[in-house]
């Protein structure tokens, strides 16, 4: 049975965003929220009837805010806004990101501060529930005033304009509506602005990256534990006593995760006079992975505030006051999403260094590049190069977008957040780091099969190894494979919901203690 998400403007969770964006969960509107939307709309209708001067209702936009618009032109004003603000560039956003954007916008409008008609909110919901996904170019937003360009592309199909995906096919907006059995609408006063003035695109993209980042942090612990198995890692750096005296939550959680994953392993060891300490990439897994866990926990908290917030301008209070402010400004999310990118980049960085330890015969005491008869065979040689390339690209992408600004709109909008760029960068860093971590898991399984003694694996590392071996064979000779196909298969296994779910049935994994 399809999950039904109840939207009230106040209680949307990150997990519910994923359910709608990726799994087709249907949504319904809360009755009290509907009443709030209707009450807010009545105030806008009164403003138009009384010919009051209110930004975006009876005036132009941006630096044209001092240009008065007659009541008879207020409808055309809103359509003009959408037609001219839909000026995005680049490839389309993924459909799951667009569905997240639609959902978050609906939830924000349900708080009843935007003056939009209930029927217009219901129309956007109809598109979402029936699987009509607007074509939104990925570039063109400054993250203030909100995400004007991409959100305008979201609105176009509601008017029978633009383009949209329906049942996997890209169609004109009108054709998508026709095939889904949806009637187009005409916008009323304030509605175009209510639909496009907000941080919804950057939040939608960043929300998906945050959720996926949480999964990646668990996968990175699995990868690190498998590398520990290969290197006969010393387990004392993961003892609880060490971490309770520095009670950083992510660090404590990581140490516990590694203990759980390695429980029962016959490959790990203890410190001896001959071998006192392991290198940082093994010994300091709790401190390195844990810092990223704490960062992403902070970002998730910010995301769940933002997806239940009003980021429109102007807003209309319950008492009927109109306030022009700056809730559309993306800075409160731009900085967290920059932080997210840095946290995910570090996971890729340390994983790549562990890949190097696996393929380096001087460090692993295994055949060079994890292949029998190196020389005739190159094995994982260039795989490590590829991981290094992704890790280095991540370092460039980790430069914060939020420290940049560029004035726009005749200097009326003179300091912007670049939050959408921050979110997009974080999503790209995530993809790169996820490939590196999947490669570490694949390489560690290859290394385990090359070890002269095949000891029992840990409670969590054993199912990880078995899941990889169900889809990928041990690589004996270069002539038997095209390694990019093997890498793609490894990524598909590791990124599948089954991989993490199976391991979490065996051991508890968490990102906070």
Go through each PLM region and give its residues.
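C-terminal auxiliary extensions adjacent to catalytic cores
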Residues: 2-25, 29-36, 40-48, 70, ...
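Short alpha-helical scaffolding segments that buttress acidic/His motifs in well-ordered protein cores
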Residues: 17, 81, 85, 97, ...
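A glycine-/small-polar-enriched, mobile loop at the entrance of the PLP active site in fold-type I
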Residues: 26-27, 86-89, 111
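N-terminal low-complexity or amphipathic/hydrophobic leaders
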Residues: 37-43, 47-65
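FAD-binding core of FAD-dependent oxidoreductases
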Residues: 55-69, 73-77, 84-107, 137-159, ...
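Alpha/propeptide regions of enzymes that mature by internal proteolysis
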Residues: 92, 115-117, 218, 302
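Conserved, non-catalytic sequence blocks in retroelement Pol enzymes and Pol-derived host proteins
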Residues: 113, 142-144, 375
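FAD-binding glycine-rich core of flavoenzymes that anchor FAD
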Residues: 113-139
